[in-house]
């Protein structure tokens, strides 16, 4: 059963808000440059991937990750990196299955954050977020055929 377009948009907004709100508010009350800010970044993604009450029902935490990164506003470089690599591996170098695409996307995202972002708490938080998402995709990855194409060319 499908809820339709409006239900999908509302779900997307709620998933993004789940990550955005705690991080955005957290940076108002905590020093973003301090290590206590790392759990604020990681908790929404961890909670989505490994829910306390439904142990086997966790998601892959991609949308929650975007919400967390958008919550870092005005520092949006990490969110832009993640969006860039998702678009790149979905449109330019197309990698299937989706789980492998997500693993590579979050790997490249973490690497770029480590190279370009100078705030240690953001580096550590993004690295842990990438690890959580990669782990979730590895344990749910099917060993089907891997297809890579460039701009829809085989």
Positions of predicted regions on the chain:
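Membrane-helix interface "capping/anchor" motifs
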Residues: 51-60, 91-104
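Alpha-helical transmembrane segments and their lipid-water interface positions
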Residues: 22, 51-55, 140-141
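Cytosolic, membrane-interface loops and tails of multi-pass inner-membrane proteins
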Residues: 1-8, 58, 142-154
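Loop-to-transmembrane alpha-helix initiation sites
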Residues: 77-84, 98-106, 117-130
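Alpha-helical transmembrane segments of multi-pass membrane proteins, especially transporters
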Residues: 11-15, 36-44, 60-68, 81, ...
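Multi-pass membrane catalytic core of lipid/isoprenoid biosynthesis enzymes
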Residues: 1-27
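Interfacial segments of multi-pass membrane proteins
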Residues: 1-3, 26-29, 47, 62-95, ...
């Amino acid at each position: 059963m499908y809820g339709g377009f409006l239900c999908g948009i509302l779900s997307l907004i709620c998933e993004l808000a789940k990550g955005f709100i705690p991080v955005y508010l957290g940076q108002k009350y905590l020093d973003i440059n301090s290590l206590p800010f790392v759990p604020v970044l990681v908790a929404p993604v961890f909670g989505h991937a490994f829910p306390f009450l439904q142990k086997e029902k966790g998601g892959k935490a991609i949308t929650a990750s975007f919400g967390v990164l958008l919550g870092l506003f005005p520092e949006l470089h990490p969110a832009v990196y993640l969006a860039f690599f998702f678009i790149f591996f979905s449109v330019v170098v197309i990698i299937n299955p989706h789980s492998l695409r997500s693993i590579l996307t979050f790997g490249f995202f973490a690497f770029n954050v480590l190279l370009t972002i100078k705030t240690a708490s953001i580096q550590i938080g993004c690295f842990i977020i990438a690890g959580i998402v990669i782990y979730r995709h590895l344990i749910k990855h099917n060993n089907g055929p891997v297809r890579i194409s460039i701009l829809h060319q085989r």
